Each structure stands twice: as structure tokens, then as C-alpha cells.
Amino acid sequence: MAESMLGLNRSHRCAEVVNAPLESEVTVMGWVQKNRNKGGIIFCDLRDRSGILQIIFEEDECGSEVFNKAMKLKQEFCIAVTGILKKRSGAFNESLATGELEVRATGLRILSESDTPPFHIEEDSKTKEELRLKYRFLDLRRPDLQRNLMVRSKVATTT
């Protein structure tokens, strides 16, 4: 069931956490890109228009209520996460601006649930154009199309 955003404010976009001090509390919002349950710890890739950020749900740190909610997350759920920004202890992902960082979740709100999308929302989608046009609202979440829209907006506002 979806929850309200009442009283909740985003502190950073996903890619902007690189400017936040380590060990600070951050609140990020976006769509679930991937969710991996490794038994006792859940890894969630959160995506917004700025990029992708890894969120860690560990039952000992976030509590059983938040952990049980995190177990229900699926691709394209819209969520808000509050947690502590930390440097990744394991392998870094050099292809991401936030590849050295993670958020250790202390709170989770599911803002909107989603059915399984008809295609993966990623940079190099091999999906047929006909299907992408049918689900244009999902296709516009892809990073390359978002970049195009931002450039178009900048050009339109400068002329």
C-alpha cells in the first residue's frame, strides 16, 4: 500500500550525495532499479533523474518493520529512503558517480507500487520501438531520453 510523503523532504538527488558529508543522514527518492535479497541484507539500486545510488537494508540496522517493507520492493516501485551515507565497504562500481557510496537505510516509505514493467528501463534498451512508444511514460525514465529532454529544456529557456 502506498504511503504519504507528508512531512518528508528529499535532502539530495541520488547523484548529489557525493557532495554530502559521510556519516550524515540523507533522504533520497526515486524508482527501484534492482532489488537483491541476500538473506538478512537487501541491496537496492535506487534511480532518479540524476543517477543511481545503492541502498542497503540490514535488519539489525533498520529494524524489522523497515526490513519487511524492503522485502516487498519490486522494480519501478517509487520509494523514499532515509539513512546514513557511508563509503562502500566492498567492491566499488566505477561506472557510477556514486559507485563508492551507499546509504544504510533507517527508514523507508513506499510512495507508489508498480506492476512489473514490460521492459527494463536502462540506458541501452534493446526493446522494440513499437513497445517503447506504447509505454512512452516508462521509456521517458531512461537516462538517455532524460538527458535529451534536459538539453531541450536548456535550449528552449535560453532562446
PLM regions and their residue ranges:
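Class II aminoacyl-tRNA synthetase catalytic cores and aaRS-like
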Residues: 1-159
